Amino acid sequence: MYHTVPYTIESPGYLKVAGESLPRRHPRAKHGLLRYPSAGVLTVFDIVRRSAKLYPDNKAVGSRRLIKMHREFKIIQDKEKEWIYYELGPYNYLSYSQYELLAIQIGSGLRKLGLSSSNKVYLFGTTSANWISMSHGCASQGIPIVTGYDTLSATDIQHSLSQTHAEVIYLDPHLLGTASIALENSQVKTVIINTGSIFSGGYDIDQFRNEHPQFNVITYEELIQLGRHNLKEPIPVKSSDLFCIMYTSGSTGLPNGCCITHENFLAGITGLLGGIDDFVSDQERVLAYLPLAHIFEMALENLVMYIGGTLGYGNPKTLTDASLRECNGDMVEFKPTIMVGVPQIWETIRKAVLSKLNCSGFVAKTVFWTAMSFKSFAVRYSLPGKGVFDDLVFGRVRQMTGGRLRYILNGSSGIADSTKEFLSLIVAEMLTGYGLTETCANGALSSPFEQTTSAIGSTSPAIDVKLVSIPELGYFTDADAGPCQGEILVRGPAVFKGYFNNPQGTEKAFAPGGWFKTGDIGEFDDRGHLKIIDRIKSLVKMQGGEYIALEKLESIYRTSQAILQVMVHADFEYTRPIVIIMPNTKFLQDKSRELGFSDDDSTLSSERMSAYVLDDLQDIARRSGLSKIETVTGVVITDIEWTPQSGLVTPTMKLNRRFILNYFRDEVEKCMQSIG
């Protein structure tokens, strides 16, 4: 079933333009870019209707209920700290026929509240079956939704509420504090509270209602009841109508709202489906836990519903049993066949495996690495027997993720080739994807039927892609020698309509002819696959005039067992970069004992500890073939957790560079000065 080279073709009807490559597209789009997944599916709610008809008894969505919150107290660095553990029940499911009725009831309830297509509903909560059902309930009545990450500040929420004039907000109870501030001076009239959230404990809804008498405060269940007693048929919606205003999680300034029509979103799903439909079926079980306010997660979940698969809702805190009591983690309980994650998730799994392996005896280590070498060789040369060690040697690792995974998919940002190969061999084959909010998650996607190494994969059949030279950075599409490289520009039905109430930003985002400028640098390899080099904003010119790619270096240095998060920092005044890291405290403490460090040297702030981490990173640089100017010369070890709540990373775990530099300004300046 392997696909044939080239994996992308030149798009018909274009003339060669100096400084640009000819646009390329997926072979499936040879006679025209794809817009809709199938006949009759022209709006988002059509996905639900179709699956309810074709797969009425299939399990659509599954959720776990909170049984009990366990509170434990531990002494950490001479201070008592409270730890919260969750006890969850088994997954309970709704069939597709039940889910369709639920969405209609939600839409009917919103209509009874007086909403129509001229109003907007703001969704502000963690990923859950209730969140996605709210989006489909809105779609059934042509009501546009506005999405906001549950980690956004009150200022950001206030900005998007004010800009969109949303009159209804749906939120989780633990976000009432943030919402209370954000709702001031907004046009919100009704607050819908999702009491089904596992994080709902300890938040007084009645108190919120009493303190805010200006709002009509109801629960998610009460909205369903309202719709059940006032049923309305879904209304006709045009594919050109607005489906969603999705606010990006950018790390600079206030977030932009991307206007996405039903046609845009369906084209995005169609593009993704075109890359995977030959290896998925209605038997797929996909664990849903990434933010639904992110385009890739929202597109993925709707795609799973389109094919009749099952969504099992989880949370990053409950994926494993580390934060649970008396129950399994989501992965073991749900047993997914496909799982999507970001680099930090995959690096955490890899490091956990290596940590346990390092505690094993000589024989166990030898067996593991021998099996790894054999399977790697068999995969590289397509030899039989590559799965012979899967149960014997890698079985325990696979059981950590439920034991049924066929594919894992990395999104959000780049991942080191070594990590991709490691997890592909011991867990499940890793696929990689590239896309943006503005392109409805479309860009490029790898396939198990297309051999590739460092490239992402073939482009989506819903878009054309071209490269434009960036002479000032040394990237050219028509160089006499060397690859065709340049900024990635995208055009097609999956591309959004523009930024909400921001005509200047929209104009700046597009090149003539409707080509969206991604800000990413790419290359088409000789197989037709798209390779991502870096973001234009992540390229830094060094003192000697050469450029280094920060995100590329971070994906490599992130493989160190000594660190959990890393940001590479470079400056024109210096010849080489430094790193700012969130340390793997347990690993470093164990390593300091192993190396015989004194108590003073074992602290994270000691010079000896910094020297050990720096030596480790420089060794990784040598083994990865990095140049001298790409090799770090200093390290800043931080003492705060890098989470969206701390502001150091975005909700999709991308680095918030400006915030990090400002937060650790003194330490960074001291480190830079020390290296000269």
Swiss-Prot record:
The keyword Nucleotide-binding applies. InterPro entries: AMP-dep_synth/lig_dom (IPR000873), ANL_N_sf (IPR042099). AMP binds at I245, M246, Y247, T248, S249, G250, S251, T252, G253, L254, P255, N256. GO terms for molecular function: ATP binding; long-chain fatty acid-CoA ligase activity. The keyword Zinc does not apply. This is Palmitoyl-CoA ligase FUM16. It is found in: Endoplasmic reticulum. It comes from Gibberella moniliformis (strain M3125 / FGSC 7600) (Maize ear and stalk rot fungus). Keywords: ATP-binding, Endoplasmic reticulum, Ligase, Nucleotide-binding.
